[in-house]
Structure formats: C-alpha cells, structure tokens
Amino acid sequence: MHLLLLNGPNLNLLGQREPGIYGSGTLASIEDGLRQEATAAGAVLECFQSNFEGALVERIHQAIGASQGILINAGAFTHTSIALRDALLGVAIPYVELHLSNTHAREPFRHRSYLADRAVGVVSGFGAMSYSLALQGLIDHLRQNG
C-alpha cells in the first residue's frame, strides 16, 4: 500500500512558527515518525511539502495509479483552494484532511474547509498526533473498503 502525505504552506516552518499553536516538533521529525508507523502497518509513505498551490495540485495528479490514499494538511489552502479540492476529486483517491490545531477553535475564517466534505475523515487539534491518527484512520479505511 502506497500513501502520500501532502503538507502545504508554512509547514516547513514547524518548530519555529508559533510553537504555542503548532508545537515544537519539526516537519522532518513528524514525517520520520509517520514513515515508521506506516512501515510497521505494511505501507509505504511518501512525503511532499510545498508553499505553492500549483505544486501541490501537480503532486496530487502524479498520485494517479501510484498512491492508494492521501493524507493532506493543506495549511491555509484548506480555507481558500478550490484548485486543491478539484484535484483531489479529479484523481478519486481517498484522502484524510488533517491539522495540527483545532481550526474550529481559531479565527472564523479558518472554520471553512474546501476539502472536508469529500474527505474520508478530518483530524484536527491533536498537534503532531493528528498525523498519526489520520494515518491510522486512512489505513483502516483502505483495508475495509479495498
């Protein structure tokens, strides 16, 4: 089973950017731990981060025929990007939306997601553990639903 983890804008700054909200762990440490979890579950996890919407759209397109599931923390693009939504729907690969912070406990403009209504599930508010919970949920979903 091949899974793709997508991280959007500013997530490359984890560990430096607003640690009170996003935690002190780096994206690299989150990805390393998640790869280990995926391997233990019999899956391969590929990670990709970009601050550019078009690069994320292109990487989603490249997942056709290669990835069985997608984990996506689109960052601020969650609340603005119809392009990411259309790309995810276009490839028809099951995906889980995830966030480090509870977006519903933050500013009102963060309450709207263009991705959530078509996602297998949404995990938010558990810090770095959101990634692990999203991975577990996606793997379980794929095993149950082929």
From Swiss-Prot:
Signal peptide: none annotated. It catalyses: 3-dehydroquinate = 3-dehydroshikimate + H2O. Its EC number is 4.2.1.10. It is an enzyme of class 4 (lyase). Coiled coil: none annotated. PROSITE patterns: DEHYDROQUINASE_II. GO terms for molecular function: 3-dehydroquinate dehydratase activity. Pfam families: DHquinase_II (PF01220). Substrate binds at residues 73, 79, 86, 100-101, 110. The record marks 17 as: Transition state stabilizer. The active site is at residues 22, 99. The keyword Glycoprotein does not apply. GO terms for biological process: amino acid biosynthetic process; aromatic amino acid family biosynthetic process; chorismate biosynthetic process; quinate catabolic process. Keywords: Amino-acid biosynthesis, Aromatic amino acid biosynthesis, Lyase. The keyword Ribonucleoprotein does not apply. Pathway: Metabolic intermediate biosynthesis; chorismate biosynthesis; chorismate from D-erythrose 4-phosphate and phosphoenolpyruvate: step 3/7. PANTHER family: CATABOLIC 3-DEHYDROQUINASE. NCBIfam families: aroQ (TIGR01088), PRK05395.1-1 (NF003804), PRK05395.1-2 (NF003805), PRK05395.1-3 (NF003806), PRK05395.1-4 (NF003807). Belongs to the type-II 3-dehydroquinase family. Catalyzes a trans-dehydration via an enolate intermediate. Homododecamer. This is 3-dehydroquinate dehydratase. It comes from Parasynechococcus marenigrum (strain WH8102). The lineage of its organism: Bacteria, Bacillati, Cyanobacteriota, Cyanophyceae, Synechococcales.
